Amino acid sequence: MTASAPTTTLGNNHGKEVILVVDDEASIRRILETRLSMIGYQVVTACDGIEALELFKTTQPDLVVLDVMMPKLDGYGVCQELRKESDVPIVMLTALGDVADRITGLELGADDYVVKPFSPKELEARIRCVLRRVEKESIAGSPNSGVITVGDLRIDTNKRQVYQGDERIRLTGMEFSLLELLVSRSGEPFSRGEILKDVWGYTPERHVDTRVVDVHISRLRSKLEDDPANPELILTARGTGYLFQRIVDAVASEGT
């Protein structure tokens, strides 16, 4: 396949959110560029993984739409490379019925997925939902925000950051939103359905693999727990879902 020059509308739409669309199918790139531009986003496109990483460095997009199967470097490889340096939201495009694609992408740090063939409206809805989470970060800092400390774990809901001792633990926007939800009702379980609705904005009408939640819980545990196989913070509620340990010795303080 002959690589096409990257397409960008950056020069004409300053101040708008930038989306990097990565797919080796030219027709999909054209459709998404047109649709996303029409609803107000700046769009940059890449036809393979190598081009995507190069464009990411120069454009610093607000969100990446990333196909799995691509030449040179596949979507998994791109996701891994991006997660080494960035928490940018990533929405994966996966093959119809291929559960392994979805789970692998989430395990590598993707925030969400859309199954091919997909409706552009569905992808637009997923993008809006994920970006709303990011927007929440940018407007954080209200007088009601604060810091919750559990042992040596410090959760700053003002800056949407987590520290273990003096070390900052890097979380994606979705991971922090999931943690924030669990902490908001510590000691009480959330069902997977509740989590999908509150964190990802999924409705019951959309049949989503609940392993989306399981994978993100696993990633959170790997980052926050001393022994992820025997968690003490994020617990499994048998037959229900998950809960954060009851905060009885936590210290809550106002953000500064």
Give the positions of each predicted feature.
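Conserved acidic segment of CheY-like receiver
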Residues: 15-27, 32-36, 64
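Basic, amphipathic DNA-recognition helix from helix-turn-helix-like DNA-binding domains
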Residues: 24, 80, 84, 89-149
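Receiver (REC) domain active-site loop signature in two-component systems and cognate sites
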Residues: 70
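Active-site beta3 strand of CheY-like receiver
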Residues: 59-65
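Short hydrophobic/Thr-rich beta-strand motif most characteristic of the beta2 strand and flanking loop
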Residues: 40-47, 55
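Acidic catalytic/metal-coordinating carboxylates
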Residues: 48-51, 74-77
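DNA-binding patch around the recognition helix
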Residues: 145, 170, 215-217, 221-256
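A structural micro-motif at secondary-structure boundaries
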Residues: 148-176, 189, 206, 243-256
